[in-house]
């Protein structure tokens, strides 16, 4: 769920999780156009992963709670998750790790999607 995702971001990143809520064309609610950079691409992939979870697992990823461990920046989805919970956990894990590796461009925070997301 979104709280677990927020906590995964906090585990793997020094930047505050809010920095990822309204970034580029895909970080935050919805998304369209071409990702503006590598970090925005992480969010596009995460959105697609959630879409797949909705169709394949018949669940609501933003509401699906799962079990995971965070230790020294390492994320592990626990074995006791159901198939759907594990799928969503891995969507969030992959995105959080991607956020940690991708450069952050301040100019892409709170961009106008009508102008920058074609």
UniProtKB/Swiss-Prot annotation:
Cellular-component GO terms for this entry: extracellular region
Species the sequence originates in: Micrurus nigrocinctus (Central American coral snake)
Main localisation: secreted
Annotated InterPro entries: PLipase_A2, PLipase_A2_Asp_AS, PLipase_A2_dom, PLipase_A2_dom_sf, PLipase_A2_His_AS
GO biological process: arachidonate secretion; fatty acid biosynthetic process; lipid catabolic process; phospholipid metabolic process; positive regulation of fibroblast proliferation
Enzyme class: hydrolase
CDD domains: PLA2c
Pfam families: Phospholip_A2_1 (PF00068)
Location of the active site: 46, 92
Tissue spec: Expressed by the venom gland.
GO molecular function: calcium ion binding; calcium-dependent phospholipase A2 activity; phospholipid binding; signaling receptor binding; toxin activity
Cofactor note: Binds 1 Ca(2+) ion.
Binding site for Ca(2+): 26, 28, 30, 47
Highest taxon of the lineage: Eukaryota
Cysteine pairs bridged by disulfides in the record: 11-70, 25-117, 27-43, 42-98, 49-91, 59-84, 77-89
Catalytic activity: a 1,2-diacyl-sn-glycero-3-phosphocholine + H2O = a 1-acyl-sn-glycero-3-phosphocholine + a fatty acid + H(+)
Main function: Snake venom phospholipase A2 (PLA2) that has only a weak enzymatic activity. It has a myotoxic activity in vivo (dystrophic effect). PLA2 catalyzes the calcium-dependent hydrolysis of the 2-acyl groups in 3-sn-phosphoglycerides.
Protein name: Basic phospholipase A2 nigroxin B
Known cofactor(s): Ca(2+)
Known EC number: 3.1.1.4
